[in-house]
């Protein structure tokens, strides 16, 4: 039986997206535009570009317009391949070259981030700071010297695993939950020594706990949800979240299907997960990592066909996670605009969050984490 909420979602996604786009022309009254304009706003996992663009497509005028409209200061952009030891090193090198070319071509809008000072400069100059990050350790293979290689190329965030097992540890869909390997321990030590941020977003529960314990500095979970609200493998338990916060880390809540156990999530689900994470971790340890593009989704038949094909491709490759479905989309229909962070701020304000707390969640917490880890 289809309840009214899911019927409205399934039949009205396009309408919701259009309504949100219309509302985007004016700032939400409950959180001042001036306050947002002064905030450091960080998407802990995302990137510029249009969702329906093919890989390696140069940024369009529309994508750059959306970057400026977003109000974002910086974004952790995935440059690594995932899930393939055969291909991911070469894929990562190509991705880094592509994004370096995009940053050079649009130096008035984009800035490569290597230090915390670069984030401050991005804010001052009203550009988007691009932080190169990994979502899998597969490009490293068994060669820890590659950490330095990729560091020289600008990478600043290293996620230990994707969903499956790799040489470092188990991802969140591995039934064995084997944790961090001996090689993984050495990898963590090398990342600490070289002052790179460790990300545990896709790690299995044991991998997450062991990596937090092993790291000498705070770590990130850049994009996840709360398992207490939606018990799916991609979400983190309260115990994991508290352990992260107790070591000084920050968790980013995503705008993904996993915010609900079933059905299409909305902004209300996102707010609930943020509220829960703040309750577990404290307001100094929560942020946002959308796991999506800055530009909104053009929700039409072509998008639905492409999305269904991507879900099937991920399943065939063995990298998908429970909760990924062709009819549950990887965006929130009522936050489908480039300035979604401003609307999230307004929703949190209506829930009673102070401007100071909202500013931390928008990006100040991740900015502080970057400064702590990168500067040592």
Q: Predicted segments — roles?
A:
Residues 2-21, 25-176, 231-376:
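N-terminal hydrophobic targeting/anchoring segments and the immediately downstream early-domain regions
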